[in-house]
């Protein structure tokens, strides 16, 4: 795979040329951040950064804020420039403005896909607790983990994201990312049941199963001034979906103190 890295003095005219190659799927420029960088450059506080400008297959995929600031100031500055044909480099770049995973997965419903993939990866790694997330130096969820998972499961995630977007538009009782993540978690056992469970959460129907009980809890929570935290709610959803698959009801929907986060084994 071709790579070339060197230090270049970038002039305003070269910066404009590079900015003209930015792909359509790239993030929009954040004017406030550009002004901040421009102010640093104008007062001479700008130094050579280890965060390289990245040109991938002729397009600028990293550095548009810095180059926009350079153009605004109208002066030349040195940059490390990486030229590559490796599209995988886009998934691990780490710029001054935090890149969201949705920027990496530039597809329809990318925001839902990326956030659902993150939730599934965290769930599979055992990083979710009823009270939030848990982290350690060994078991963590990285951007690369999320991108890899999303790319391997893109077709299924895209279908789920499109479905949950339509359902959410009718009755927004459950976040689209949680709904898509539920389908993703349940589909290996029974995709049809997973889709039906999530659909029932939004649209209702029936009064004698776990989907009905969970929908009532979601409606009650959405109307409450004291809402359950998202991790706790996701745990209830997992527990409820497991009961739905088994043809049982969960009874009182809660996670007791000391209880481990629900699984879908």
Regions from the language model: what does each represent?
Residues 1-84:
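Short alpha-helix boundary/capping and kink motifs at helix termini
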Residues 71-265:
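Solvent-exposed functional surfaces
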